[in-house]
Amino acid sequence: MSLNNVPAGKSLPDDLYVVIEIPANADPIKYEVDKESGAVFVDRFMSAPMFYPCNYGYVNHTLSLDGDPVDVLVPTPYPLMPGSVIRCRPVGVLKMTDESGEDAKVVAVPHSKLSKEYDHIQDVNDLPELLKAQITHFFERYKELESGKWVKVDGWEDVEAARKEILDSYQRAQNK
């Protein structure tokens, strides 16, 4: 089955399906799911010896301003396998700019049907401060050793901003 058949979610923007590309704490390898075949490709070996602080993936049938689907970070108690799909709800967004332009990262937690562990997290301010600091630190530095690449973290925004990011990106993809 192609991952293209996975819907964006059950009820956007609050009930998403996130396709995982990179597990939390995995080796510094950037994987990307090929949208046509559904295969997980090695995009590059990261120059900085850093680990993604959360599972990293995307929402199908969305189109961000950078031309890719919406990027999503998913904290979980265990790393998720690349190519797996997890049901989530958004809680915030890390606004960033890189060499290609605006590059927001939505943060979403597992749906309560998967785990009650995240039920108390309703907004980005409910996330542990250490986790937010780790995410910020990672994205400020993960491209530092790659020639011609850079990142500027613009800051955290709330659940409403995350919902808007998802809905705008979904609408953009539908109008494409």
From Swiss-Prot:
The UniProt entry, under Pfam families, shows: Pyrophosphatase
Q: Which cofactor does it need?
A: Mg(2+)
Q: Which segment of the chain is annotated as a signal peptide?
A: none
Binding of substrate occurs at: K30, R44, Y56, Y142
Q: Name one GO cellular component term.
A: cytoplasm
Which EC class heads this enzyme's classification?
A: hydrolase
What are the recorded Gene Ontology BP terms? Answer: phosphate-containing compound metabolic process
Disulfide pairings: none
E.C. number: 3.6.1.1
Which superkingdom, per the lineage?
Bacteria
List locations, semicolon-separated: Cytoplasm
Residue positions binding Mg(2+) 1: D66, D71, D103
Q: Which CDD domains match?
A: pyrophosphatase
Q: What terms describe the molecular function in GO for this protein?
A: inorganic diphosphate phosphatase activity; magnesium ion binding
Its keywords, alphabetically, are: Cytoplasm, Hydrolase, Magnesium, Metal-binding
Annotated binding of Mg(2+) 2, by residue? D71
Cytoplasm as a keyword of this entry, yes or no, is yes
What InterPro entries does the record point to? Pyrophosphatase, Pyrophosphatase_sf
Q: What chemistry does it catalyse, as a reaction equation?
A: diphosphate + H2O = 2 phosphate + H(+)
What does the protein in this record do? Catalyzes the hydrolysis of inorganic pyrophosphate (PPi) forming two phosphate ions.
Summarize subunit and interaction data from the UniProt record for this chain: Homohexamer.
What is stated as this protein's family in its record? Answer: Belongs to the PPase family.
**Name assigned to this protein:** Inorganic pyrophosphatase
Q: List the source organism.
A: Vibrio vulnificus (strain YJ016)
